Amino acid sequence: MIRAKHISNLSSSARSFFLSGSRPSAADGNSCTCAEDESGVSKRQQIRTEVVQTGKRASNLAAGLAGSILPVEAGKPLVVPKTVEHFTRPSLLPQHVSSPALPGKADSVNHASAIIKEDVGVPIGDQIFKAGIGNVNLLSDIANYKIPLSDGTEVVGLPKSCMVDPTRPISGVKSSNVKVIRREHLAKVYPRSADRVPINSSPGTKQASNDVAGKSFEAHDLLSNNVSGKRKIMPQRPYTDSTRYASGGCDYSVHSSDDRTIISSVEGFGKPSREMMKVTPRTAPTPRQHCNPGYVVENVSSILRRFKWGHAAEEALHNFGFRMDAYQANQVLKQMDNYANALGFFYWLKRQPGFKHDGHTYTTMVGNLGRAKQFGEINKLLDEMVRDGCKPNTVTYNRLIHSYGRANYLKEAMNVFNQMQEAGCEPDRVTYCTLIDIHAKAGFLDIAMDMYQRMQEAGLSPDTFTYSVIINCLGKAGHLPAAHRLFCEMVGQGCTPNLVTFNIMIALHAKARNYETALKLYRDMQNAGFQPDKVTYSIVMEVLGHCGFLEEAEGVFAEMQRKNWVPDEPVYGLLVDLWGKAGNVDKAWQWYQAMLQAGLRPNVPTCNSLLSTFLRVHRMSEAYNLLQSMLALGLHPSLQTYTLLLSCCTDARSNFDMGFCGQLMAVSGHPAHMFLLKMPPAGPDGQKVRDHVSNFLDFMHSEDRESKRGLMDAVVDFLHKSGLKEEAGSVWEVAAGKNVYPDALREKSYSYWLINLHVMSEGTAVIALSRTLAWFRKQMLVSGDCPSRIDIVTGWGRRSRVTGTSMVRQAVEELLNIFNFPFFTENGNSGCFVGSGEPLKNWLLESYVERMHLL
């Protein structure tokens, strides 16, 4: 029987890192600030052409662990070792783009949330970048009854591939399972561009004036549509100056020794005008009976943008002298991004003589608070709404469902769904579409499809937008054939696909690496009379890039400009990402510089792409400078940023690289670093580790599932390769129990189970398989029922440089051989190991199955 013990010097050395006094406590001043960019997910598995011996890699990890991942001392700058070439490139910071000032916390509004205990200025997992045009998320749009247009004017978030995928090879060799597309076949789509944009000059039309510089932009879901092709100026969402986060009694905090205040150099953006700074005696407002309503809305909005809510804002509004009705108030509230300012203005209006809020203003305020996850304030507001005689309607409930859903509070969203029906409000298409979307994104596809069925039973036949939502959900859940069937059903039912639907289908096929099908759909879309929008161009650029045709992708960029589409940060970020994945660091860098020259402010996903490129080619000093530039710009390293750094540390081939990655992890200031540093020893039953992981995942609740999956994969792989295998097993069990890996284990039919490991790193796959087989053994001993068949899916290396060299498959096959698992393969599928019948039952009775993960 295999016992839990230190197998080598590696284990004891690695364990000393977590158990020694060097592990800082909350009092040591090691803390984190964190905010999240739009999703983009860093997939953990890194394919290598050679198999590195476990013992050799393990010893390298152990040698570099102690002290390598400790946070930098307060006030002491990170010293780049002399062995690293000094960074000599031009500045990573924009030369003429200033970041706006960070307003302080509102002092006149005191908030208590029933669910969110602390107000995080930029919520983790929900850092949004405003794309500079009038974009709104589809579900938010339809929740507001703003039906998106289909005129090709939408800019939405790029697919998650904008985040650098470490599983892709550096070289341009394409996997053999992808049908090769010859360049001549692309002539009907996009030829090489003769007038390709010069990289060293500004590739985009610089339309942002000085008052646009430094503002943040919002990336959106694939289902969004915009209402204007022109860039719309939006103020940057303020960042809260707080650097402390706590959850469930666990402090993941960092006390920064270098508090930076970024002041906007843009004249008049972050400060009030001289006229408004003058102190004037308070006089009664002079009603302007014949004032243009648009004039009032514009000027009040301008005042509220200049001031944080407080005495100065009230004074400015009083001096302006106006009479506002509920309609105008609603228009102002819709333009406000800071919930504290919006709430202060809302209650100030309520105190004005003759003013009365209506259902529209209450509903808009519910949406503002929902975006900030201020659910305690929402409940108070709903009570006031009822007391004021404004009964919540379907739109109000839809806003609330959407707010809970985007914060991953699915149970609360369903409770609101039930409450609205009890209150006599009938759910509409928007209600069902929202519930379908949030459950599918969280991995609960069965509930999503059940809601689709209930919608049809309620007599709500799906329209184009409903079909688009469900097709997107099915595709993102990995059910592309079902999504395609629904697309065909949609056409058969007389629902004409719009531009959004085509964009979804093209993106799904591109994600599935069906590049030729994606390009065919693109041609079909044009033949149907739809002109490409910025989303379409971005998807086609990605398809061409993954086919190895990066020059043609640049040609698409040039045509996009010729059609008067102004490239934004995600478009530039895609080109940075594509060239980085191709191993061309210089081209990736040139596109990053082109973005700065176009007057655009970098966003976190683009920085992550460039960071991954530097790490991949071991340019550590450049990675360090990029990370510092992010902090100087006020960009908070995201969960994906930390996942990249931890993955690089795990796969480091020298103690120097490992130590430097550890220092970068500390510099990032992400709460995940404190979580890793405070990892307790497993103990006799592993309960301390499970509690620690559970508290952290609760703290990171609002992060999207794919981001959490990427981090947990990196953590389990790191612990496994460091010899901390008991801890790795406990981390996996908690992550699986919290549905971080919804597709890892599935019962295909009665007593026929599927274990899906192909999206994991090799270390995580070994731990996941070991603990899952141990669970089967435990269930069999308790109930006497044994699975009749188990399929273990590893994939066969389609993402490897050479097909069939999947590191996951090799690691799993080695583990099964060591323990004499009675497996076989079917139909020549080397990426699926099958065990069944009596041999499987006899094998599960062996006692060593319980301790496989310790080998």
Swiss-Prot record:
Classification lineage: Eukaryota, Viridiplantae, Streptophyta, Embryophyta, Tracheophyta
Family annotation (SUPFAM superfamilies): SMR domain-like
Species the sequence originates in: Arabidopsis thaliana
Pfam families (alphabetical): PPR (PF01535), PPR_1 (PF12854), PPR_2 (PF13041)
The name this protein goes by in its record: Pentatricopeptide repeat-containing protein At1g74750
Ranges where the Smr domain occurs: 755-838
Protein family according to the UniProt entry: Belongs to the PPR family. P subfamily.
PPR repeats: 358-392, 393-427, 428-462, 463-497, 498-532, 533-567, 568-602, 603-637
Keywords: Repeat
Region span, Disordered: 21-40
